[in-house]
Amino acid sequence: MALPADPDCYWVEPDRLLAGEYPRAFVESTARARLRALLDCGIRTFVDLTQAREPLAPYESLLISEAEERALTVSYHRHPIRDADIPSDAGMREILATIRASIERGDPVYVHCWGGIGRTGTVVGCWLVETGRAGDDVFEAIKALRAGTMKRRTQSPETSDQADFILDWPSRPSD
């Protein structure tokens, strides 16, 4: 499926896992257009990595409204991670389990944080590790996947802690 023009995003796995920035805009009509674009490209599960206290307008009710107008069933899951930080190991396992279960049901996923770079890149990196990538190949893959985005020049993930989390992911012990 084609990418929506807005929000800025990229397919991690075509027609299965899309990653990018927060889909809500300050102007409601723009927010609705963004959500419609995501629904129109097949997204049925939204994984929100932002915290409720971040200065972002919520979009869950708009999403449900847009989905109902199209007779679509969608799901919204918030797995909050502090901005520029990493999740707990258990938190990452929950995020990846949500993504995996949705894909297995045939429901394409949109995973996002605020800018679609740090927290999102961390989740994408761990997903790539779990699906067979290793070491620096993960970061090259993320860079290649993001090549068509507006924010492609910004490193993803953003912090060394996030990169280390990905590199350590396959050997991380359970909490």
Regions found by a protein language model. Give the residues of each.
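Cys-dependent protein tyrosine phosphatase-like superfamily
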Residues: 1-110, 115, 122-175
